[in-house]
């Protein structure tokens, strides 16, 4: 009989109640802030981290989950009799975590020669709940009797379509991290300039700029409309950091534009907000497939 484990990292931003419900282990990322190392999901809540960023002198930095950590985790699952382990990783282009997870399988062979557990390491090509949500769906279907191979194939198809539209209400964090110049950040904040950023296949791009906070949600929705064929047929999620009023306004406008409620409304965790800052909102949606080969039928 199969015994299947599901593993991901804390960048997935899966709420703990969902992780517990579907039997998903979430490994925390280390985050360093002003010389102190913290472990995400252990040492702070999301709201605490936002305040820590506001109070900090420097910018938070993240480190990859190591090969040794993965090897220890794999060995634990193998020792507990698991037949399969699926690890869904943060975008490989933005972290060495994916490569460490792959290389850890070689270490496991040294630690547990002849182990029979099948390990799948999957690159999500994205960040946050865009992969966390669909991983929950994959685990839910498998737990309810679905075939692992078909559920993983469906997961990959969803990841091939997912896109993010993000807006930052302050350029302070981006200035600290070097993503924008100090001069541009100061001028931008003084003029109330808010960038509208797309994140597609792990690549971020400033798609436009608006002036004033009030213009942000409409500009985000307009961008999403340009990326999909039918808003009413498009599943979506809403992400936020610390400002619940902005969250509620975006949810309200999205419900009107899409014609239905979001799949989930969630908070961005430490890994993502370390780069965007504590004042951001986002729309996650299913766009068009990027890799049509992912949809080709498997031939016998």
Set out the residue ranges of the language-model regions:
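Mixed-charge interfacial surface used for oligomerization/domain docking
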Residues: 3-5, 11-25, 30, 93-106, ...
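Aromatic side chains
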Residues: 22, 38, 49-50, 70, ...
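N-terminal glycine-rich anion-binding loop in soluble enzyme alpha/beta folds
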Residues: 5-69
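Generic signature of intrinsically disordered, low-complexity segments enriched in small/polar residues
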Residues: 41, 47, 52-53, 73, ...
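Glycine-rich phosphate- or other oxyanion-binding loops that anchor nucleotides, phosphorylated ligands
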Residues: 55-58, 64-106, 148, 152, ...
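Glycine/charged-rich beta-loop-alpha catalytic/anionic-binding loops adjacent to active sites
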Residues: 53-55, 83-87, 111-122, 265
């Amino acid at each position: 009989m199969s015994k299947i484990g599901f593993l991901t990292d804390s960048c997935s931003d899966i709420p703990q109640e969902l992780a517990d419900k579907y039997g998903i282990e979430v490994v925390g990322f280390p985050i360093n802030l002003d010389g102190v190392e913290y472990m995400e999901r252990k040492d702070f809540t999301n709201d605490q981290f936002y305040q820590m960023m506001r109070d900090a002198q420097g910018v938070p930095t993240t480190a990859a989950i190591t090969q040794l950590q993965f090897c220890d985790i794999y060995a634990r699952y193998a020792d507990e009799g698991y037949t399969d382990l699926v690890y869904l990783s943060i975008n490989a282009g933005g972290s060495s975590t994916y490569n460490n997870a792959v290389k850890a399988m070689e270490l496991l062979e040294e630690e547990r020669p002849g182990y029979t557990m099948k390990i799948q390491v999957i690159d999500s090509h994205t960040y946050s709940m865009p992969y966390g949500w669909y991983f929950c769906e994959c685990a839910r279907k498998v737990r309810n009797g679905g075939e692992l191979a078909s559920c993983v194939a469906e997961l990959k198809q969803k990841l091939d379509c997912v896109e993010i539209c993000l807006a930052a209400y302050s350029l302070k964090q981006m200035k600290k991290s070097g993503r924008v110049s100090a001069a541009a950040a100061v001028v931008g904040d003084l003029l109330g300039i808010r960038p509208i950023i797309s994140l597609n296949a792990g690549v971020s791009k400033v798609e436009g700029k608006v002036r004033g906070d009030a213009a942000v949600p409409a500009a985000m929705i307009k961008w999403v409309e340009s990326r999909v064929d039918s808003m009413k047929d498009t599943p979506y999620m809403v992400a936020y950091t610390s400002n619940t009023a902005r969250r509620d306004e975006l949810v309200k406008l999205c419900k009107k534009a899409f014609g239905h409620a979001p799949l989930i409304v969630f908070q961005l965790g430490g890994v993502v907000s370390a780069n965007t800052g504590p004042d951001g909102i986002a729309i996650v949606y299913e766009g068009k497939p990027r890799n049509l080969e992912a949809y080709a039928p498997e031939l016998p």
